[in-house]
Structure formats: structure tokens, C-alpha cells
Design a protein with these regions (language model features):
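Charged catalytic and DNA/RNA-contacting regions of genome-maintenance
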Residues: 1-317, 330-333, 337-346, 350-443
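ATPase nucleotide-binding head domains, primarily ABC-like/P-loop NTPase cores
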Residues: 28-31, 214, 286, 297, ...
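Active-site phosphate-binding and catalytic loops of NTP-dependent enzymes
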Residues: 76, 99-108, 235, 376-380, ...
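Conserved catalytic alpha/beta cores of large enzymes that bind or transform nucleotide phosphates
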Residues: 157-163, 497-529, 629-632, 636
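Amphipathic heptad-repeat alpha-helical coiled-coil/stalk segments that mediate oligomerization
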Residues: 188-196, 203, 253-259, 265, ...
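Charged, surface-exposed helical/loop "interaction arms" that form contiguous linear patches used
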Residues: 347, 351, 364, 379, ...
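Short flexible coil/turn linkers enriched for glycine and charged/polar residues
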Residues: 10-12, 67-69, 110-111, 122-125, ...
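C-terminal tails and terminal domains of large nucleic-acid-associated
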Residues: 814-851
Length: 851
């Protein structure tokens, strides 16, 4: 217990998994913690110490469950064979398992990244280093303080390392529920960071990475390297990390957290399900690496036309050649997750199955490279061919030395084939010959003793033995030594059998020891090639994702969009990719043109497709910037710098923000940051306040965005806004068409030019199941109000002054009768009182009393 407490005192923030033989044991408070967290049985030792344990072969699953609940696990292993220990077995911490440092296959999800992040704020800029230990990813980012939420949403961070004094960052991280690791400020020192980076990448200056030695981001990068070394208990744990790349924000279209959620890129708003998301539609990658890259590309669209068109050219080759696409995808389907295998090699967590999977995957490199022909694929083909040449010796080494169906763990032995290592062959020969020797020996002693029922056997507890029935026991010779007494038999050992047993058991140990040594040497050879393996993994991921784009395009009828520098948007027969897949041939496509009039006001009934329309335009624009083809008959997309959305508030009541407050905060972000090159979609601004306030805000917001000149789709239920198109050439009106027939309406889901002045809300209420008497009464009230409010509404909007004089806006708002009507409690009125009140309103609205 003294040894245990020493390790526990050194890592008080962790639950300590303490290896004792075939189990990991937890004691005292740790035992109570795991018992409560994951339901392990709590027991006590003789001295009253609480304890709990898990079998070593199942420990990874328990560790994962602990980490998922926010705990950190320190793993303390036996560093020597207990049989050779003269006192307490030597032990040591071999790794610390945290949310951002997972490397074992059982702890990770194939299609999701697991990013570790370090942050430091300097002059209102947050410097960020991002690493993924399991794949070797290493990137540097800079974001403004007010854009931290967006960065967290876009990157999908599992754990953040931050200085203890970074209150602003800490509060944001805690709000997101991300695992937080606080470190003293000196861990982020730029001088120490520069030294670590130079040592890691073998350079004398960091200028080749686009950063200076004293840049604050260097300290952040150093902090993440130091943390990886601590958690993996090795300075070799980050040998596979790529050289740090500084990500320039101008290279990517900016998507804030609201946009990623609103467009349902990764998961749906309702249910938080991946099924029904954009990623769900686009996911036809064959490799785990491709699946992770696809998610990254969808959240980080390209902003440079040349980079987009380079991707498009490759997608087009695959789209036009079904045979090539099929061949490549079949080859990719055989490639294992070599990026994460490389990570496990670097961290010492690699298994025999990993090694064999790596060898098989590397052999496919040649085949894939040979299939890639043509100008568009030339650079990928050349790079893959170069990597194949470099990695071929390693692939041959692995496949020639290892069996095709390897054991799960090296402790089981049996990984290597016969014939390539003489020492291993000799040990195995002794094991194989054991069966024949035992058979011969049994025949010999049966003949010598004349005991026909005598048998030679083996079990793990007693080893080898000679078994004789009780009835024949008095006939055994003197050189038989009794070893075990059974109910109906006696078991013996002889000097010859004991000598044989020692030789066989020694051979088993020799074979396993030799295999473990050979495995270590093989892993060392893999480590020498690790940077080429990581480069190969990157190329495979890119190729897989581009082939995936082509596969989706051909499967669902997507086209290559034209990318232009001018701020225009022309989409013919555009479709929402998710609904198009779900509804198949029943989805109604629509055009969108935002050129001379970049702001379109869209009116029409509820449930008629306004929200779907504006979302599909945003998603088509996003897909075009990833290099993918798009769901349309044709499309010309002008480059955008940002995509903004305001398409339905999610209440943030826990943060003290109402639905309307969230709506206004998100709208403020758009108004303060949108540029002429942005795309903005707005859905029903102003619903969370009074009619007059909402209309006023919507009007002013539309005018402001018109002034910016950004491409905007503004869906609204305020029909008064359509008057803006009469006075502002930047604004045009669109509406969703319906067909009226026998007092019923049919939604056509078609977008057409012009305005509409009806919302058909009562019809929507009817089909939603509102009782008939309520629907009938609503129609009566609507007919009365429509007649008397139409003139007042038209007059009010016609008198609204241009934007510079908006201080006079409220003098010309629609009739105050609307506000008075909203204050009436209908249930408190008798029929006669209601009639009299309606007649009074009628008289006033008609101008008999006041105009």
C-alpha cells in the first residue's frame, strides 16, 4: 500500500489503475469512485480498506467509461516479472488517459477526431495549438476572443489545456462542457516552447513554419508537446506529429457555431442525430481517415478559387469514369486506419493486428497509384508512387514475417511465421516435438509397467503427470513419485517426465520472449518510416474524400458548380441534399438568383418551404466551397468569405437568454460582421416580440443588409416588408406559391418572383388538428380584420421614410387597433359585449370617429 499511495499522491487528480497480477486494482477513495461511476463491486481487504478491481484484458473498456464521465485515469503497470522480484514488484506510471490523449482503438470512434488543444490569450487574440495524438495532426490557429465559440464548434475539441489565469477562456470552455486541464502560466513560456519545437523537428529556427521564436503561439505549441510527453510517459510519444502548420483564416470560409448547427452539418437540431445531417448524406468514404477528413472539409470550406477548382478537377475525373472510381474505392476499402496505427506505434500501444493491418494496407499503395492517370490526378499519383517506393520494403518485411491472422495481444505469441528466425524456430521445434515425445513415452512406460490404462497428461496447475487408476496403483514402479490424489486415480511424476516438462516450458518461454523481441525490432523499423506512413495516410484520406464527392454526385445527380470571384449567386433547380435523399423524386427543386438585387425577401405560407429554400441555398454554397459537386441542374457561385444563418432560435434559458435575446444576439453578430462577400440567410426575424417591434426591427435589419450589399435570403411573415423592393433596387421579392381550390390550399413548394400578402396560417392550424370551431371563428375574425386593416397597413408602409430618417418610423406604423385587439380577453366577453366592441372598432377604423 505504501507503493500505491506514493503513485496516488503524485497524481491526486487521477483515478489510479494499479496493476496486481492479472487485475488492475483501485483502493480507498478511488475504489469508491469507480464503484459509483461504473458499478464495480466494492469489497474490503482484511484491514478495512475499500477496493475494486477489473481484469487486465478488459481494462480498456472500463477506462473508456471513466473518461466518458469526465475522470482521468493513471495506469500503473508492473515493470518486472513478479517471479523475479526479490521484494515489492517494480511499478511505474506508463500513461495517463484523458479525453484528449486517447490512442487505443477501443477508446476511439473511427469517424470522429479526438483533438487535444492548448490555448493562451494575448492582446485579445487567442493562440491555439491543436494536436491529435492518435493520428499525428498538429496545427496552429489564431482567433479573436469573440470567435472562440466558433473555433470550438468547428474543430470539435475533446480537451483543452489552458493557463490557470485565463479566466475568459476557462469560462467559455466550461460553458461548452469540454474537459479542461489547467496548468501554471510558465508552461506556456515561448522560450521553452521554441526549444521543444526545435528539438522535436530537428531545426534551428521556426521561421520555416511561418512563426518567430518569440511568438506567443510557440509557447502554446510547447505546452501541448509537454503535456503529451507527461500523459504518455515518454518523450517519443509525439515522434509522429506532423510539422506544425499555421492555418490562415483567409484560406477558409468562416462558419460560426450558429451556422454549423443551423445548417445541420454534423447532426440534426431535433434529436442531435447524425442521421438526417449533411454529413450523413455525403458520407460515402471507404476509410476511417477519409470519414474524419470529410467532416473537417464540411466545417472548413475553402475560400480560394484555385484550391476549390483543384479539388473539383479530381472529383470530375472520378465522376466521369465509373470504372476508375469503383476500382479506387475497392482498393481504399482494404486500407485500414493507418493514421491511428502510426499513433499507436509512436505511443507504444501498437498490437500485432495493427502491424499486420499496416503491412496489408501499405501493399495497396502501389495498386492505387498505378490506377491514377491524367493531368488532374498527376500530383496525387506521383506522390503516392514516391511513398509506395519508400514504404515497399517495410510492407514486404511485415507481410513476409507475420501470419495473416495475428493474435490480439503479443502476450499470446504466434505472430511470426516459421523460417525467418533460427532461434524462434528452435524453440518452436521443441514445442512441436513435445506431442510426439509424450506419445512415445506413454507407450514406453505402459510396456514397462504392463498397466494398460496408464495415461500421460497435462494441466496448467500441476503440469505434466502420469495417471494410473486406483485399482492399478500398487503396480507402479519405485521411480514414480505421487503428485496428486484423485477420487478414482493417482497422478505421478518421473525424473524423465520432469526433465521433459522443464525443457518444454522453457521452450515456450523462450519462444514468447524471442517473439516479443522480434516484435520490438519490427516496431522500431516501423517507427523509422513513421513520417512516410503519416504522409501516406494523409494522401489516402484526401483521395478517399474526393472519390466520395464523386460517388455522391453520380448517385444523387449533382453537378460541378462554376466558381467565380464576383459576388453573384445563380442556382438552377437547386435541391436540399438531405430532403432530396429522403423524398427522392418527390422533392421540388427551385432556382435562386442574387445578382443585381442581392437581397431577396421571401414571403408565403407557413410549412410551404421558405426555411427549406433558404437553407438549401446556404448548403449548396457551402458544398461548392468544399470542392464538391452540388444538388442542382447548374450553379454559378461567387466566392464568399462567411456564411451567416439566423434560422430559428434555440432557447438558452440556462444562460439567462430568452429565445428573442438569442435571436437578437445572433442578428447583431451578422450586422456587425457581414461584408459584401458574405452570404446571409434569415428566417422570421422578430417573432419573439410584439408585432410592431418585430416589424420595425425586421425593416431596419433588411435596410442595413441591403446597404452592405451581401447576398441575403430573408424569409419573413411581415408582408409589409415587401414594400422595400419598391424603393430599393438592391431588394427583390420572392414568394412561395400555393393553389387555392374549394376553400382548400395546396402547397406547391415553388419559389416565384413577386410578393404575397397571405400567410394561410389558419389553414396550417386546420391541418395541424386545431378544433373546427376554433378554425371557423378564426376565419370570421380574419375576414373582419383583413378588410379594415388593409388600407391602414398600405398607408403606413408607404409613409415610412428612407433609412436616414428612421427616427420618424413609429409615426407611421400600422393602426393601434391591432395592439388593442391583442389586449382583449375574449373568454371574459359575453356575445353581446363582443358584438358591441367589434362595432366600435369598425366605426373607428372606418374614420367615423378618428382617422
Amino acid at each position: 500500500m505504501q507503493q500505491y499511495r506514493g503513485f496516488k499522491d503524485a497524481h491526486p487528480e487521477c483515478v489510479l489503475f494499479f496493476r496486481m497480477g492479472d487485475f488492475y486494482e483501485m483502493f480507498d477513495e478511488d475504489a469508491r469512485t469507480v464503484s459509483k461511476a461504473i458499478g464495480l463491486t466494492l469489497t474490503q481487504r482484511g484491514n478495512g480498506i475499500d477496493m475494486a478491481g477489473v481484469p487486465h484484458h478488459a481494462a480498456e473498456g472500463y477506462m473508456r467509461r471513466m473518461v466518458e464521465q469526465g475522470f482521468r485515469v493513471a495506469v500503473c503497470e508492473q515493470l518486472q516479472d513478479p517471479a523475479e522480484a526479490k521484494g515489492v514488484v517494480e511499478r511505474g506510471i506508463t500513461r495517463i488517459v484523458t479525453p484528449g490523449t486517447l490512442v487505443d482503438e477501443s477508446l476511439l470512434t473511427d469517424n470522429q477526431t479526438n483533438l487535444l488543444c492548448a490555448m493562451r490569450c494575448n492582446d485579445k487574440i487567442i493562440h491555439i495549438a491543436v494536436a491529435e495524438i492518435s493520428t499525428g495532426l498538429f496545427e496552429l490557429h489564431r482567433v479573436a476572443v469573440d470567435r472562440l465559440d466558433d473555433a470550438l464548434e468547428r474543430l470539435g475539441i475533446a480537451e483543452v489545456i489552458v493557463g490557470e489565469d485565463e479566466e475568459t477562456i476557462i469560462s467559455v470552455i466550461e460553458h461548452h462542457g469540454i474537459s479542461l486541464t489547467k496548468r501554471p502560466a510558465w508552461h506556456f513560456d515561448a522560450t521553452e516552447g521554441a526549444a521543444l519545437l526545435k528539438k522535436q523537428f530537428g531545426v534551428t529556427t521556426l521561421s520555416g513554419f511561418g512563426i518567430d521564436d518569440d511568438d506567443p503561439i510557440v509557447g502554446v505549441a510547447g505546452a501541448i508537446l509537454e503535456y503529451i510527453g507527461v500523459t504518455q510517459a515518454s518523450t517519443d510519444a509525439f515522434v509522429h506529429l506532423r510539422t506544425p502548420s499555421l492555418q490562415e483564416s483567409s484560406d477558409f470560409v468562416s462558419l460560426d457555431a450558429t451556422t454549423i448547427r443551423s445548417l445541420e452539418i454534423e447532426q440534426t437540431i431535433r434529436g442531435n442525430s447524425s442521421e438526417g445531417s449533411l454529413l450523413w448524406v455525403m458520407q460515402r468514404c471507404k476509410t476511417a481517415m477519409g470519414k474524419r477528413l470529410l467532416r473537417r472539409w464540411l466545417c472548413e470550406p475553402l475560400a480560394q478559387r484555385r484550391a476549390i477548382e483543384q479539388r473539383q478537377a479530381i472529383v470530375e475525373v472520378f465522376a466521369d469514369d465509373a470504372t476508375l472510381r469503383s476500382t479506387i474505392q475497392q482498393s481504399l476499402d482494404q486500407v485500414q486506419d493507418i493514421a491511428r496505427i502510426a499513433g499507436r506505434v509512436a505511443t507504444g500501444r501498437v498490437t500485432p493486428r495493427d502491424v499486420v493491418a499496416l503491412g496489408t494496407s501499405l501493399f495497396g499503395c502501389d495498386e492505387i497509384a498505378n490506377e491514377l492517370t491524367g493531368d488532374a490526378l498527376k500530383s496525387i499519383s506521383e506522390e503516392l508512387t514516391s511513398l509506395a517506393t519508400k514504404l515497399k520494403p517495410l510492407a514486404e518485411m511485415i507481410t513476409s514475417r507475420c501470419i495473416e491472422s495475428p493474435p490480439t495481444h503479443m502476450r499470446d505469441g504466434g505472430l511470426f511465421v516459421d523460417g525467418f528466425d533460427a532461434e524462434l524456430d528452435e524453440a518452436r521445434s521443441l514445442q512441436r516435438d513435445a506431442g510426439q515425445w509424450l506419445s512415445n513415452y506413454q507407450a514406453q512406460i505402459v510396456e514397462e509397467t504392463n498397466i494398460g490404462t496408464l495415461k500421460v497428461g497435462y494441466n496448467r496447475v500441476f503440469g505434466y503427470y502420469i495417471e494410473v487408476s486406483r485399482a492399478q496403483a500398487d503396480r507402479v514402479p519405485d521411480n514414480f513419485t505421487r503428485k496428486q490424489t484423485l477420487k478414482n486415480a493417482e497422478r505421478y511424476i518421473t525424473p524423465e517426465l520432469k526433465t521433459f516438462e522443464d525443457r518444454v516450458l522453457s521452450a515456450e518461454s523462450m519462444a514468447l520472449t524471442r517473439e516479443q523481441q522480434l516484435f520490438k525490432e519490427l516496431c522500431s523499423s516501423i517507427s523509422e518510416c513513421i513520417h512516410n506512413i503519416v504522409a501516406f495516410a494523409d494522401m489516402i484520406a484526401r483521395l478517399d474524400t474526393l472519390a466520395c464527392f464523386a460517388d455522391v454526385a453520380m448517385l444523387y445527380g449533382y453537378v460541378r458548380p462554376s466558381i467565380v470571384d464576383e459576388p453573384i449567386l445563380e442556382i438552377q433547380d437547386g435541391r436540399h441534399p438531405v430532403l432530396d435523399r429522403l423524398l427522392q423524386d418527390r422533392f421540388v427543386p427551385n432556382d435562386c438568383v442574387l445578382n443585381e438585387s442581392p437581397l431577396a425577401l421571401i414571403t408565403g405560407p407557413n410549412m410551404a418551404g421558405k426555411s427549406t429554400y433558404i437553407r438549401q441555398v446556404a448548403i449548396i454554397t457551402l458544398l461548392a466551397h468544399t470542392g464538391s459537386f452540388v444538388p442542382a441542374k447548374s450553379a454559378t457561385i461567387g466566392l464568399v468569405d462567411r456564411i451567416f444563418t439566423r434560422v430559428g432560435a434555440n432557447d438558452e434559458l440556462h444562460a439567462g437568454q430568452s429565445t428573442f435575446m438569442v435571436e437578437m444576439v445572433e442578428t447583431a453578430n451578422i450586422l456587425n460582421n457581414a461584408t459584401r462577400n458574405s452570404l446571409v440567410i434569415l428566417d422570421e426575424i422578430g417573432r419573439g416580440t410584439s408585432t410592431l417591434d418585430g416589424l420595425s426591427l425586421a425593416w431596419a435589419i433588411a435596410e442595413s443588409l441591403s446597404g452592405v450589399g451581401c447576398r441575403t435570403l430573408f424569409a419573413t411573415h411581415y408582408h409589409e416588408l415587401t414594400a422595400l423592393a419598391d424603393r430599393d433596387s438592391n431588394i427583390t421579392n420572392l414568394h412561395v406559391t400555393v393553389r387555392e381550390w374549394n376553400d382548400e390550399i395546396v402547397f406547391l413548394y415553388r419559389i416565384a418572383q413577386g410578393r404575397t400578402d397571405r400567410s394561410y396560417g389558419i389553414h396550417v392550424a386546420k391541418i395541424a388538428g386545431v378544433p373546427k370551431n376554433v378554425v371557423d371563428r378564426a376565419n370570421e375574425v380574419l375576414n373582419t380584420l383583413t378588410v379594415h386593416n388593409a388600407q391602414a397597413s398600405d398607408e403606413a408602409t408607404s409613409h415610412i421614410p428612407a433609412e436616414p430618417q428612421m427616427g420618424l418610423f413609429t409615426e407611421y406604423l400600422p393602426s393601434p387597433l391591432v395592439e388593442e385587439l391583442k389586449q382583449i380577453d375574449i373568454n371574459a366577453l359575453s356575445p353581446m359585449e363582443a358584438f358591441e366592441l367589434l362595432r366600435e372598432f369598425n366605426r373607428r377604423a372606418s374614420g367615423e370617429d378618428e382617422h
